[in-house]
């Protein structure tokens, strides 16, 4: 596998561990991946619940919690640490400022177009900025806006395909449409980015994400022009993952039929593992219409059947009567819990085997 270079950062293994909230990827998982030569990513989503003891104010608790997680990751790891901050979060600006102040290596940002992300950088900032997109058009808009308004271009871009877990940047009818597959979109994004690279003489690596599960998958997308990959689902079933054992076991026990598309209160489709809670939602369950968090810009709790941050927090703790686990399309393929070291070693070995010429091709 080739080294992944993002600005002056070099990851020995071109694997980014995707940010997963609420509480699934914190300092434990991120530092473990970074120590193995990949890029570990802390999710900023929902930290106000995990760190509610630090402040009665959800936003303040979340920012204090994020700073604490970044510092813990730094203590545990010598490698590259990133933070995922969704544009849809109401405290997006505060979380970005905290990440930059803590000198995190990279901010990954999706669930909306992060058009003002460079505005938070200061002259002495070292943090790299990496948007997450679902189309060539989206990265073109971001590059043009960033260059025109801030004289800045993305340090890399993540293209997240429709087989990813969690919230999806696609309409529901596009999820099974081959025209929107990762393999179809990736060359388009690589070509779009190349125009800005050539015009402004800046390298912008494209990272492929969504449904990448094996070393063979990594080889396939890198042959299509990706400089690296982002994996989330594969890292959930690791000993270092910050989720509860019950959360991890929900992946191990899942069958292919259990992976389903849901309508999130955020207003986007999402991919999750079937649970009793989701059955209640489909049956018309209505929860109290009071929201103490206001954590998502697009979420009007008076029109939604449940609070998503509470549901995801419950799942993080293993309470599936009152929550559910987001998961990628390949979550059902998981058979056991292993260490991050074992997982990355397995991915590398799979990649090496797929890179060997077959007898017939010699």
Q: What label would you give each PLM region?
A:
Residues 1-199:
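Active-site entrance/lid segments in N-terminal catalytic domains of soluble metabolic enzymes
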Residues 16, 164-207, 213-362:
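Conserved active-site-proximal phosphate/metal-binding subdomains
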